[in-house]
Amino acid sequence: MAFLCSSLPSSSSIAIFGDPNTDGSSRSYLSIPSLKLRFRPVAASSHICAPAIDKSTFVISESVSEDELWAAACLRVRTFNELNPSAYNIQDHRRYLAEREFEALKERTSGKREGFTRVACINATLPLSQLSSSFEDLCSACKFSDGIEDRVVVGSLDLNQCRWLPDEIAGTKPEGIGVDFARAYLSNVCVAKELHRNGVGYKLIDKSKRVAGEWGITDMYVHVTVDNEAAKSLYMKSGFEQETAEPAWQARYLNRPQRLLLWLALPTSPIMSM
């Protein structure tokens, strides 16, 4: 399936498996300072054969280096934008988009983006040695070094601790003082098309739950377009349930498919409940 590439702005959650972009086309907005967050929903993709991957070599972790952030930005550009390979200066355009996403990602994860308490870029990576020559394009675009070996970012999402995401439906939980620190949203969820059907989306969401719990988050949200059945299935199987739907007039005004807001209650840690 084509992964949602969730919006942070890349849609909140819509990006995990590549739904069309947030405006209803097959692309999705980059999450950059001047643009809204992007989400790409998961879309089924039956024509892609899942490669044989040693799943024990997956590492799901928060990005800790600029090299890894750059690789994640390149994966998002590759996932959220349908670019004609034969177009003039296509490589220059891809790099331009990646640079914008990279700078926006650095701004968010460093705590400099107004309105966000904290943002983590969570990536799924594989050793370069695990990927065959048939993955040359992916490896070339999304490779980085962790200081020990070369690895490739094959999935990514943002965990955003904030009240709401720009131009998106806001969650209602928790209420009261907790809204300032205990609510989070997933966005820019994406998985390389070559690695679909390897459980990467579930691994990313599971990791985001653990990180959110460490932050004291009690309520996690994600957005998904109403017709993205694959994305909804992914989130529902991960424990999310529908809280509300975007008003049709708002979707028309923003010139995009109508979205659903999904909610997940996270267990309260013993320390938090004392």
UniProtKB/Swiss-Prot annotation:
The keyword Plastid applies. Its EC number is 2.3.1.255, 2.3.1.48. Expressed in green tissues. Acetyl-CoA binds at residues 189-191, 197-202, 228-230, 235. This is GCN5-related N-acetyltransferase 7, chloroplastic. The gene is GNAT7. It comes from the Eukaryota. It holds the Pfam family Acetyltransf_1. Its main location: plastid. Protein acetyltransferase with dual specificity triggering both N-alpha-acetylation (NTA), with a large spectrum of modified N-termini, including methionine, alanine, serine, threonine and to a lower extent valine and proline as substrates, and epsilon-lysine acetylation (KA). Keywords: Chloroplast, Plastid, Transferase, Transit peptide. It catalyses: an N-terminal L-alpha-aminoacyl-[protein] + acetyl-CoA = N-terminal N(alpha)-acetyl-L-alpha-aminoacyl-[protein] + CoA + H(+); L-lysyl-[protein] + acetyl-CoA = N(6)-acetyl-L-lysyl-[protein] + CoA + H(+); N-terminal L-alanyl-[protein] + acetyl-CoA = N-terminal N(alpha)-acetyl-L-alanyl-[protein] + CoA + H(+); N-terminal L-seryl-[protein] + acetyl-CoA = N-terminal N(alpha)-acetyl-L-seryl-[protein] + CoA + H(+). GO terms for molecular function: N-acetyltransferase activity. Residues 1-65 form a transit peptide. GO terms for cellular component: chloroplast. Residues 75-267 form the N-acetyltransferase domain. Autoacetylated. SUPFAM superfamilies: Acyl-CoA N-acyltransferases (Nat). One of its GO terms (biological process) is peptidyl-lysine acetylation. InterPro entries: Acyl_CoA_acyltransferase, GNAT_dom. It is found in: Plastid, Chloroplast. The active site is at residue 235. Belongs to the acetyltransferase family. GNAT subfamily. It comes from Arabidopsis thaliana. Oligomer. It is an enzyme of class 2 (transferase). Signal peptide: none annotated.
